[in-house]
Amino acid sequence: RDVAPSRGLGDVYKRQDENGMNIRGVYERSDAKVRLNEGLERFKGFIGEEFDTKVMIEENGVKYYVDVQDGQKTGFFLDQKYNRKAIWKICPGAKVLDCFTHTGSFALNAGMAGAASVLGVDASELGVEQARENAKLNGLEDRVSFVCRDVFELLPELEKKGEKFDFVILDPPAFTKSRSSIKNAVKGYREINLRAMKLVKDGGYLATCSCSHFMDTELFTKTIGEAARNVHKRLRQIEFRTQAPDHPVLWASDSSLYLKFYIFQVVDEK
């Protein structure tokens, strides 16, 4: 390898090894481009012994195969743990659409919670392939299916066909990673929420979130409200949540509060 492991993780591994923790190996993913902005080197590779980087985990009673080496970030988004659990009460018997499903986490939680049918959508072939594997791993392949499509293209097609869902979930990637692109991000969030609301049955539910700290809570809330007015929907807020507590919010750092997660009941204006 051309670059050494990050000093922090390398030192932790060394100390744990010296203390008899018997950690045989670590796969480090300090490869985010943002490290360069901070003058930090990027590193991706093993510390200690090598091992199979396709691992199985369990969260909320749902099992997943996780690709630590080549998956997005570290292969799984742990910050949504309790938000995934929050949808369980809505899902029994429901027809569910999960947009930007990644490796199927929200879709699989919906299936485990008793949804009648779940369709997960993602533009990544690798993500959809893993999501299908995860459905089989949990015995959900008969009720939870996945398609590899661009969500912005698929939702208007579903609307044109007259499709309706009891519950639509939006978990998109960050539409903005800088202040300079907030304006375009607002358009993206407004459009995707507008399209999703059109697919929700009268009295059905929408879960929607943003993982960009540049899209603050006030602006995100305003954008969702604009989308609802544009399609003549009234929103009843069921829940507002943020990231899991192992991703703590630091009051001295606004950027640490980055994840916003809403559940709404969507009602047609009469």
Where do the protein language model's features map onto the residues?
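Conserved SAM-binding loop of SAM-dependent methyltransferases across substrates and taxa
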Residues: 103-115
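S-adenosyl-L-methionine
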Residues: 129-166
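Single conserved hydrophobic/aromatic residue that forms the stacking wall/gate
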Residues: 2-13
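C-terminal catalytic and target-recognition region of SAM-dependent MTase-like enzymes
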Residues: 191, 205-270
